[in-house]
């Protein structure tokens, strides 16, 4: 009997902790919760810098999204496919400020994962220094693009 109570109480404690963690996410409706952050696609077309400024003004600590694991890509791609109204590419927070193929995230997190489309990045005509998710790859692969191009964009925030 004592062993059963221990197992039952341990199981209840595990369920409680699991539910507490899920609730602690607090992402608003139509945002994607993932790894303690919330992601939202904005369909308004903006240049990369304007998109980053929009994310920062939306809520302190928000930025264009950074992607750090292969496992995050399919979830983000599915979310964008569900909520993106249009065919444009989607800005993320990766850029090459130094214009020397040293890519950095706007949230200053480590550049520990890259998912370039075929033959990318190429800095085509020495003009492409901002990164977009490519629509014809299902938003899974990246392309460097002219920063003044107008795209939808993906913000990440902590709520």
UniProtKB/Swiss-Prot annotation:
User: By its UniProt entry, which SUPFAM superfamilies does this protein fall under?
Assistant: C-type lectin-like (SSF56436)
Keyword entries, A-Z: Calcium, Disulfide bond, Hemagglutinin, Lectin, Metal-binding, Secreted, Signal
What is reported on the regulation of this protein's activity?
Hemagglutination activity is inhibited by lactose (MIC=2.5 mM), galactose (MIC=10 mM), and raffinose. Is very weakly or not inhibited by gentamicin, kanamycin, glucose and sucrose.
Q: What is its main location?
A: secreted
Uses, biotech or industry: Can be used in the treatment of bovine mastitis, since it is able to both inhibit bacterial biofilm growth, and disrupt existing biofilm, without affecting bacterial cell viability.
Q: Which cysteines are joined by disulfide bonds?
A: 27-38, 55-155, 62-157, 130-147
Signal peptide feature range: 1-24
Lineage: superkingdom: Eukaryota
As for family, the record states: Belongs to the true venom lectin family.
User: Which PANTHER family is this protein grouped with?
Assistant: MANNOSE, PHOSPHOLIPASE, LECTIN RECEPTOR RELATED
Q: What else is known?
A: Negative results: the lectin (up to 200 microg/ml) does not aggregate human platelet-rich plasma (PRP) or washed platelets (WP), nor does it alter the aggregation induced by ADP in PRP or by thrombin in WP.
Q: What does this protein do?
A: Galactose-binding lectin which recognizes specific carbohydrate structures and agglutinates a variety of animal cells by binding to cell-surface glycoproteins and glycolipids. Calcium-dependent lectin. Also binds lactose and raffinose. Shows high hemagglutinating activity on mammalian erythrocytes. It also involved in immunological functions, since it is able of inducing potent neutrophil activation. In vivo, it causes edema and increases vascular permeability after injection into mouse hind paws (10-100 ug/paw).
Q: Can you state the subunit structure given in the record?
A: Homodecamer of disulfide-linked dimers arranged in two 5-fold symmetric pentamers. Binds the gentamicin group of aminoglycoside antibiotics at the dimeric interface near the intermolecular disulfide bond.
Q: What is this protein called?
A: C-type lectin BJcuL
Q: Which organism is it from?
A: Bothrops jararacussu
Q: Taxonomic lineage per UniProt?
A: Eukaryota, Metazoa, Chordata, Craniata, Vertebrata
């Amino acid at each position: 009997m004592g062993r059963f109570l221990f197992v039952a109480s341990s199981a209840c404690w595990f369920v409680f902790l699991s539910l507490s963690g899920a609730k602690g996410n607090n992402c608003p409706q139509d945002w994607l919760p993932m790894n303690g952050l919330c992601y939202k696609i904005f369909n308004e077309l903006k240049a990369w810098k304007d998109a980053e400024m929009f994310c920062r003004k939306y809520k302190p600590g928000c930025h264009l999204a950074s992607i750090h694991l292969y496992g995050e890509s399919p979830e983000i791609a599915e979310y964008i496919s569900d909520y993106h109204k249009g065919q444009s590419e989607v800005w993320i927070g990766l850029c090459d400020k130094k214009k020397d193929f040293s890519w950095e995230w706007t949230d200053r997190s480590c550049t520990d994962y890259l998912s370039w489309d075929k033959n990318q990045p190429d800095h085509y005509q020495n003009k492409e220094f901002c990164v977009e998710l490519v629509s014809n790859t299902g938003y899974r692969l990246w392309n460097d693009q002219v920063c003044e191009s107008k795209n939808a964009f993906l913000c990440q925030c902590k709520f």
